[in-house]
Amino acid sequence: MDYMKLGLKSRKTGIDVKQDIPKDEYSMENIDDFFKDDETSLISMRRKSRRKSSLFLPSTLNGDTKNVLPPFLQSYKSQDDEVVQSPSGKGDGSRRSSLLSHQSNFLSPANDFEPIEEEPEQEENDIRGNDFATPITQKLSKPTYKRKYSTRYSLDTSESPSVRLTPDRITNKNVYSDVPDLVADEDDDDRVNTSLNTSDNALLEDELEDDGFIPESEEDGDYIESDSSLDSGSDSASDSDGDNTYQEVEEEAEVNTNDNEDDYIRRQASDVVRTDSIIDRNGLRKSTRVKVAPLQYWRNEKIVYKRKSNKPVLDIDKIVTYDESEDEEEILAAQRRKKQKKKPTPTRPYNYVPTGRPRGRPKKDPNAKENLIPEDPNEDIIERIESGGIENGEWLKHGILEANVKISDTKEETKDEIIAFAPNLSQTEQVKDTKDENFALEIMFDKHKEYFASGILKLPAISGQKKLSNSFRTYITFHVIQGIVEVTVCKNKFLSVKGSTFQIPAFNEYAIANRGNDEAKMFFVQVTVSEDANDDNDKELDSTFDTFG
């Protein structure tokens, strides 16, 4: 099949597509005009001529008929130009032509043929439409045949070359003549040849098979020579010569038919497969393909191919690459070092919003806690005191200051007593941990505890408390150094935080509990009054604040 004629010529009928066909208002061609038979086509001529005659007429008909060759065979004139007279007496003469008929599969000494009968109506219709019809053939009625006849023709192959009408094919009636399926059925046992017909005369073969009639002159392997080679007076020796010539041409046709594009591609593919890999002694195949690194096409790097053999592949001739000079390599290295040393410039965060407030939770500053604690303005002075750079601060190293003081108002008598404690130091510490109470008491000054005492009260976190007790004749003053405490005085409750001060009057019940998450520290001072203090409530004490005034 010629694929270059797709859409131009019918594959099966051989009808050419009409180019100048009138179209209707919808730009559509008339289907009758589109498939109208071309009178000048070779297939239509052969079809019409084939329908007019059965190709093999009897030697004698019923008295009034005459042996006349079909019109399409009258062109083959014999060399002896033998004149045949009509029995009717009209004097119409015709030259008898020799018909070359050779069967492709077998030869018999005497070829006996029985004419194929056709219906009179169909024959008459075909005769009316045929331009080659003769008056004699038009008068023929339905023939009745009395005997069979045989024909023999000599074939001279020495002078002119033979002309091949149709390609070789198997004349087996069981062969499926239509286009085979691409996938054969499993239950199809009667399949001999499922290959597509790709010969040059496939169109003509399909036409002849569709008509259901295969003329003897068009059987596969028949050849027709020029007019000069036809000889009606040939004997059996000429038949044998023609058979030998036919076999030689048949072998040549088989070679030409098989030598198609598919076979050529298969041969080339086998050559490529055998050379594209190396098989070692273990049977492993190693590819010989050339591996090329990715090319920089922007630098005009490319692979140049060239055909070095008859194989259907191209071989690599050369690979064009770009080589950087030493100066360029040094420049690139310097640029890399510069990028590494360059500090990143401060830029806006990826979540920057024009409102000025970034999205999401801000990052925690590790130095935030240190900034919350205010710096001690006396830090430098404390360092100088601890180092001994300032006078009157040496006792802090010992923790307790004991000095000589007066002990009487009337007498000039002095005595050494403890008058100061360093931070986190006390004279004694008492801890009480029971079911109802949990606290610690640091006593600092208690030499005259029947009148006066002072110290620090500590309440542990969560569970620290001092149960409800009576103050009797003692006044107690507390200053909260750390934490949060809940104070109960008589029937009153209140909270005290860091830096606050509260007092417990005499003759009242009081209780203290820790309500914070850390330890609570309170400095206290207590003073005990005499028993007759209630009698002197109305008297004025002139010396109460004389020491601060």
UniProtKB/Swiss-Prot annotation:
Localization in the cell: Nucleus; Chromosome, Centromere; Chromosome, Centromere, Kinetochore
Basic and acidic residues bias (residue ranges): 263-275
Keyword Transmembrane helix: no
Source organism, top-level taxon: Eukaryota
This protein's UniProt keywords: Cell cycle, Cell division, Centromere, Chromosome, DNA-binding, Kinetochore, Mitosis, Nucleus, Phosphoprotein, Repeat
Compositionally biased residues, Acidic residues: 114-124, 203-225, 238-262
Region listing for Disordered, in residue ranges: 47-275, 335-374
Entry GO MF terms: centromeric DNA binding; protein-containing complex binding
Residues recorded with modification Phosphoserine: S325
Low complexity: bias regions: 226-237
Name of one Pfam family that matches: Mif2_N
Function of the molecule: Component of the kinetochore, a multiprotein complex that assembles on centromeric DNA and attaches chromosomes to spindle microtubules, mediating chromosome segregation and sister chromatid segregation during meiosis and mitosis. Component of the inner kinetochore constitutive centromere-associated network (CCAN), which serves as a structural platform for outer kinetochore assembly.
Family recorded in the similarity comment: Belongs to the CENP-C/MIF2 family.
Note from the entry: Present with 465 molecules/cell in log phase SD medium.
Protein name (record): Inner kinetochore subunit MIF2
Gene this protein is translated from: MIF2
